[in-house]
């Protein structure tokens, strides 16, 4: 009798992360979306050749798209397919989720940011964050808080010795 495969941790299926988004924006909510991909793009994702740091998500004609996501084509890709690494890709969500995002972006002055790309079984998914931009003083406050937490941990560690 064959053993069942143990379920992987969510972090182990991560393809790419946008760490810059947490620095530049207050992310209030995250929603999972599928991505419309071509065959060569899936192969490149499996080898980890993707960058979502410079990507942005926008709404057009009641649909949500991601632009600026760079998927580098493999050398062994098919010769009869023209690979465009930065093409605009459609994000796949339910109509209810799309309407909710459109309403929040238009009404509350929020923006949409791609935060993480990961695998769910054999499908590539993107977490889209509903975010508000940080001002310079917000970034300074975050930096001070991060430094204080680091110093606090250092003090606690030395006091336990």
From Swiss-Prot:
Localisation: Cytoplasm
Pfam families documented for this protein: SmpB
Keywords: Cytoplasm, RNA-binding
Any single Gene Ontology cellular-component annotation: cytosol
GO terms for MF: RNA binding
Keyword Cytoplasm carried by entry: yes
GO biological process: trans-translation
Region listing for Disordered, in residue ranges: 137-161
Biased composition, class Basic and acidic residues, residue ranges: 139-154
Protein role: Required for rescue of stalled ribosomes mediated by trans-translation. Binds to transfer-messenger RNA (tmRNA), required for stable association of tmRNA with ribosomes. tmRNA and SmpB together mimic tRNA shape, replacing the anticodon stem-loop with SmpB. tmRNA is encoded by the ssrA gene; the 2 termini fold to resemble tRNA(Ala) and it encodes a 'tag peptide', a short internal open reading frame. During trans-translation Ala-aminoacylated tmRNA acts like a tRNA, entering the A-site of stalled ribosomes, displacing the stalled mRNA.
Family: Belongs to the SmpB family.
NCBIfam families in the record: PRK05422.1, smpB
PANTHER family: SSRA-BINDING PROTEIN (PTHR30308:SF2), TMRNA-BINDING COMPONENT OF TRANS-TRANSLATION TAGGING COMPLEX (PTHR30308)
Name this polypeptide is given: SsrA-binding protein
